[in-house]
């Protein structure tokens, strides 16, 4: 029998990460993956106020896909020394594979939101893209 879950975004608790010392950045999120009980993929909705950002970083194993739900963002994406800067808005997707630097700053006027999906769903803390060796 297939295993499935259904959840409405409004049913997923919004968490203020500034209240959790071990987890930067100080943004608000909805941990959709926790509400659904996913095991293979991480799913979060990140909320941004003007000027807030997720700094430029990379992951050793995880590929991350993003989708802009609301607002305008300035992306920094690509290999260290060869980054691109791109302005994106609602309806835009972008993806960063393992060891690919990526970060984004909210440049909109109202609250912004991004859906972030990462796989594999492993403990994969952010790496400094400038310290990664190129093959």
Residue ranges with predicted function:
Residues 1-40, 55, 126-135:
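A short, N-terminal "cap"/entry segment at the start of jelly-roll beta-barrel domains
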Residues 3, 103-135:
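Double-stranded beta-helix
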Residues 28-31, 44-60, 98:
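Conserved short histidine dyad/triad with adjacent acidic residue
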Residues 33-35, 54-60, 77, 85-86, ...:
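Short histidine-centered beta-strand/loop micro-motifs
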Residues 47-49, 60-79, 117-120:
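Short, conserved beta-strand element in jelly-roll/cupin
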Residues 53-55, 74, 92-94, 98-104:
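Histidine-centered metal-chelating micro-motifs
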Residues 79-99:
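Short acidic-glycine-tyrosine-enriched beta hairpin
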């Amino acid at each position: 029998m297939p295993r499935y879950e259904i959840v409405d975004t409004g049913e997923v608790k919004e968490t203020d990460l500034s209240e959790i010392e071990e987890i930067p950045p100080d943004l608000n999120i909805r941990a959709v993956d926790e509400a659904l009980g996913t095991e293979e993929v991480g799913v979060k909705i990140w909320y941004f106020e003007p000027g807030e950002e997720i700094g430029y970083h990379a992951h050793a194993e995880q590929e991350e896909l993003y989708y802009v739900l609301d607002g305008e963002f300035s992306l920094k994406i690509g290999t260290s020394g060869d980054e691109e800067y791109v302005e994106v808005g609602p309806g835009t997707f972008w993806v960063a594979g393992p060891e690919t630097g990526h970060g984004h700053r909210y440049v909109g006027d109202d609250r912004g939101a991004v859906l972030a999906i990462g796989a594999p769903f492993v403990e994969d803390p952010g790496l400094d893209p400038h310290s990664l060796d190129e093959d």
